Amino acid sequence: MSAYSRPVLLLLCGLLLFTISIAVLNTLVPLWLSHQQLPTWQVGMVSSSYFSGNLVGTLIAGRIIQQLGFNRSYHYSCILFALATCGLMLSVDFWSWLGWRFFAGVACALIWVIVESALLRSGTVTNRGQLLAAYMMVYYLGTVTGQLLLGVVSTQLLSVIPWVSALVITAMLPLLFAHFSHQDSGDVPHIAVWPMLKRRSARLGINGCIISGVLLGSLYGLLPLYLSHQGMSDASVGWWMALLVSSGIIGQWPIGKMADRYGRLLVLRIQVFVVILGSIAILGNYALAPALFILGCAGFTLYPVAMAWACEKVSADKLVAMNQALLMSYTIGSLTGPTMTSLLMQRYSDNLLFIMIAGVALVYLMMLLRKPDQQKTPFAAV
């Protein structure tokens, strides 16, 4: 029996439309704020507000799914995102956009947890890997499509918000024709997340997810601003962001295969080293396209390899708790990365974006080069 049943395909179609909307806004929001002459640190704070919403959404998703089920939770999350998107048209100021992007972040995290949980529930032990692989491919495909759209449509706020909101509402339609059952909360044992964060054997994976969050959060939130300050148009920024994400898609399969064959520790070391090389190449004003390509290949594949490292350290009954802990770790990194980096960029130079990325990557590389039994982390028990 195929893993891609009719409900699964409909769910992935909805996710594709939703992800296109996310990608468009994640690129244009910092550009719109920059056009309004807001300082760089405020642009970074708005990006961090979105990731704060991601963290809150991750924490409340389980209870919402238990109370409402997959379908209703999905529809309400889409409505919340559409409302938060329309709110951007009311006024372009720091405080209101801080709130609207927070609610958008909550909605996005809810959608991610809902889709992932529904796919895992509908799959079996033998095909869950295929389902999650399809999930990642659809997510990145939607991200690239959103970036490419910026080159063919108007990027003015009042032009973009209506069709993006309509796209989100359209993303609700596929799940009107599919149903995902959810067990009662009494059938699901309580899962503690904090002990997973303290697990010594998984510390490299947990730290890797934090570093991945810092890296990708900074790139998503501040790279459009960096490119805009280099004199690029909004359409050009979209093309460069599409190249970055496309390289992440290309790198998924071969890097995953290498991690299975040669070991995740070796591959993590190579990935982090390549991230440092890509950052140095951009700082040195070398060819931007190859530098962004290798940065995307290594950076966008860091999270799944680190996640696999951590998940192989726990038993099957603890996988859900570990996955939730890793997503929280990634979100914390995504929250702190743009905040710290934007403050440094505002005070010193836009080049601090890639200096920061190279710096945190170097710290993680030093951890990876130590023997596993010598690792220390702020989360791991000592």
Swiss-Prot record:
The chain crosses the membrane at residues 8-28, 41-61, 73-93, 94-114, 133-153, 157-177, 208-228, 235-255, 274-294, 295-315, 325-345, 349-369. This is Uncharacterized MFS-type transporter YE1530. The keyword Glycoprotein does not apply. The keyword Iron does not apply. Belongs to the major facilitator superfamily. YcaD (TC 2.A.1.26) family. Its main location: membrane. One of its GO terms (cellular component) is plasma membrane. InterPro entries: MFS, MFS_dom, MFS_trans_sf, MFS_YcaD, MFS_YcaD-like. It comes from Yersinia enterocolitica serotype O:8 / biotype 1B (strain NCTC 13174 / 8081). SUPFAM superfamilies: MFS general substrate transporter. Keywords: Cell inner membrane, Cell membrane, Membrane, Transmembrane, Transmembrane helix, Transport. One of its GO terms (molecular function) is transmembrane transporter activity. It is a multi-pass membrane protein. It is found in: Cell inner membrane. PROSITE patterns: MFS. Pfam families: MFS_1 (PF07690). PANTHER family: TRANSPORTER MFS SUPERFAMILY.
